[in-house]
């Protein structure tokens, strides 16, 4: 791997892309430390320590600590992620957007432009909720119209700026820019999380216990990475045979192909959807400054991941069961709108293709649907395990980490995709790359 990086730096074009990406990473980390003018950072850190919950802890991890610092990048690229998911769903639901998607490069540019506008609108809404909601509780040094407007403008501009950086990385750097931004944010929190784990389970312990703890910690991390790689790269290939045809004096066809069905077709989207729905009431209550009393207080605890796996309060595990059910549901839902067995079977029939042992047409679509449901179930269970494990770890050992669950899925997926992109560029120049190691 190091040899590959060394060889990559020998190529001027590739070296420029890598250096540009690293430069943008530095800009992002600097921006995450710049506070929003007029905001009381000490108050917010105190509030976060006393009242924060699992939803806000995850939000802070994804923003690389920008949220806790209440920096100009506090909203980060969350509005863009939400906007992209919304546009993906609308593209399938609205025929006009679907036509744009099929119009090639011009259509995709139009959809990208709409996504940017939706991102700014969502950022504006979230910034307003934060400035007004938290501002009334003491976040703003002076709660007046000028500070509110300044905070809203700064937070919205920060989110738009990160979106712009992500697009520039995609255009001039290595990998998908938005994904790179997300990974940098998550990775920036890992040293602190590892430090907390070592502080709790290693430092001050007897040598034998400390060594065992280190081995277990890294074994769990490596095991989860391997599982995520399997989920990300696992593929079931359905063989397809094409019948022979006579065109003029030539016999054509008779070729074989396959339909690749990924184990985790939906990626991390089911987890993001489930967490968004679970966290929405928690966010609204926090912005409104209402922690809840009586029944509502209990409802918030059922939705708070800190209580899900607490051995002393197992009744709140009902919230975890709801979370698991939503992940599985969204895995099937997202796959159903992105993969159409009936359309694929129809196209195969028109092209003279068939699955060996399966009749063309409806039997083929039924077979594909049956196999797809089986694969999606396996992927959903694996995805659920990876997403839920950190909550089990947190509940049993009272330790929270951001390098597990959703964060780990994102990191591994982006790193693998970026490695493949570098590998493809290296192979063009006859270099041995990552994937051969």
What kind of region is each of these model predictions?
Residues 1-101, 105-437:
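N-terminal cationic and glycine-rich segments that engage phosphates or anionic surfaces
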């Amino acid at each position: 791997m190091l040899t590959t990086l060394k060889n990559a730096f020998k190529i001027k074009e590739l070296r420029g892309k890598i250096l540009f990406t690293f430069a943008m990473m530095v800009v992002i980390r600097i921006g995450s430390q710049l506070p929003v003018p007029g905001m009381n950072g000490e108050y917010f850190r105190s509030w976060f320590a006393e009242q924060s919950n699992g939803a806000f802890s995850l939000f802070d991890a994804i923003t690389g600590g920008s949220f806790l610092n209440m920096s100009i990048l506090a909203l980060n690229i969350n509005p863009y992620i939400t906007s992209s998911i919304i546009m993906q769903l609308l593209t399938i639901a609205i025929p006009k957007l679907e036509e744009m998607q099929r119009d090639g490069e011009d259509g995709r540019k139009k959809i990208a432009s709409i996504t940017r506008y939706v991102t700014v609108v969502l950022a504006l809404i979230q910034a307003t909720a934060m400035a007004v909601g938290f501002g009334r509780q003491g976040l703003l040094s002076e709660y007046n119209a000028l500070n509110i407007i300044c905070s809203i403008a700064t937070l919205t501009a920060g989110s738009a700026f990160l979106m712009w950086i992500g697009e520039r990385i995609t255009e001039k750097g290595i990998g998908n820019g938005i994904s790179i931004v997300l990974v940098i944010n998550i990775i920036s929190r890992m040293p602190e999380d590892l430090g907390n784990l070592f502080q709790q389970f290693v430092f001050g312990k007897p040598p034998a216990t400390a060594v065992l703890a280190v081995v277990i910690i890294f074994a769990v991390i490596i095991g989860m990475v391997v599982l995520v790689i399997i989920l990300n790269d696992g593929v079931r290939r359905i063989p397809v045979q094409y019948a022979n045809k006579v065109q003029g004096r030539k016999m054509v066809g008779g070729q074989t192909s396959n339909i690749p069905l990924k184990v985790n077709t939906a990626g991390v989207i089911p987890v993001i959807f489930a967490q968004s729905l679970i966290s929405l009431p928690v966010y609204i209550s926090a912005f409104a400054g209402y922690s809840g009393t009586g029944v509502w207080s209990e409802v918030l605890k059922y939705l708070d991941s800190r209580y899900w796996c607490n051995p002393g309060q197992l009744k709140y595990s009902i919230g975890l069961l709801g979370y698991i059910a939503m992940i599985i549901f969204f895995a099937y839902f997202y796959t159903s709108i992105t993969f159409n067995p009936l359309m694929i079977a129809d196209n195969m029939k028109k092209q003279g293709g068939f699955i060996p042992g399966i009749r063309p047409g409806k039997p083929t679509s039924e077979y594909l649907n049956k196999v797809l449901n089986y694969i999606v179930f396996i992927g959903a269970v694996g995805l659920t395990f990876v997403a839920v494990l950190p909550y089990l770890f947190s509940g049993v050992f009272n330790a929270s980490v951001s390098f597990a669950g959703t964060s780990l899925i994102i990191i591994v997926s982006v790193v693998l995709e970026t490695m493949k992109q570098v590998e493809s560029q290296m192979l063009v120049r006859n270099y041995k790359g990552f994937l051969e190691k």
